[in-house]
């Protein structure tokens, strides 16, 4: 029988686990300000391609898929390619990141995410030298590729799943967590809610 006032084995285990979690350092790739910066970049790129590059959404491909289907339904096959190419570039970006991850996972001198960030910054310089109008398709393909690279590489902030190139999922999760908070009044849930809504605001 456990001595009164002393935690049981199960309680000690839970307490030790909580202390361990509190002292585990947050990875740089999951830090709040890095994710905030990436989220602002994601929001800017969506505005940039839609306003200045022919009304194409570079980040989330839902809009492009809808417009692709609409153009096909209306018989505008050639115009539909305008939306198909960014979708294909997005898919290639996902595959590219997985290749980078597999190739450099054990590389001790450089983390694979550092390679991704360097590549993203380099590629985002190119549209500045590509004239609006004549190069819109190429720019949209390039930015869709970059956004796929970002969303596949940076998927967590402080251990929580998050998206840095779109806000629908973040908005859904934050609102869902409100329901749980109203029932539990758990402080950690409240912090998660705040974090998700902050990312939505940074995207805006």
Where are these regions (language model features)?
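Acidic, Ala/Val/Gly-enriched low-complexity intrinsically disordered segments
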Residues: 3, 11-14
